[in-house]
Amino acid sequence: MNKTEFIAFMTEHGHNNKHAAHKTLTKADAEKALNLVIESVISAIKSKHNVNLTGFGSFEIHHRKEREGRNPKTGAKMKIDAYNQPTFRAGRKLKEACN
């Protein structure tokens, strides 16, 4: 499901959720809300803060050290620079919903 399909899902399937406060949510409002959440998570991660959404999961930064790698085509050694890797770890409610 891509972002557009998810926004449509949020507006069309809100009535199936007994706790749905978004029963009258328009697609424009749903898109604004989703964009705000995404931008907020990105901003927090850029600021080196972990984001924990209880039940859903957590977004974290893991620092990867500089290391030596190989070019798979030529086999030549090359340096892979250090970088920060964003990661997501699913929460209990999300894991339970999948099983």
Swiss-Prot record:
Q: InterPro entries from the xrefs? A: Hist_DNA-bd, Histone-like_DNA-bd_CS, IHF-like_DNA-bd_dom_sf
Which CDD domains does the UniProt entry name for this protein? Answer: HU
Q: Which SMART domains match?
A: BHL (SM00411)
- Pfam families, A to Z: Bac_DNA_binding
What's in the keyword line of the UniProt record? DNA condensation, DNA-binding
Q: Which PROSITE patterns match?
A: HISTONE_LIKE
| MF-aspect GO terms | DNA binding; structural constituent of chromatin
Q: Where is this region: Disordered?
A: 63-82
Task: Say yes or no: keyword Transcription regulation present.
Answer: no
Which terms under GO biological process does the entry name? Answer: chromosome condensation
User: So which domain of life are we looking at?
Assistant: Bacteria
Q: So what family is this one in?
A: Belongs to the bacterial histone-like protein family.
PANTHER family for this protein: DNA-BINDING PROTEIN HU, DNA-BINDING PROTEIN HU-BETA
Describe the function of this protein: Histone-like DNA-binding protein which is capable of wrapping DNA to stabilize it, and thus to prevent its denaturation under extreme environmental conditions.
Assembly? Homodimer.
Q: What is this protein called?
A: DNA-binding protein HU
- This chain's source organism reads Rickettsia prowazekii (strain Madrid E)
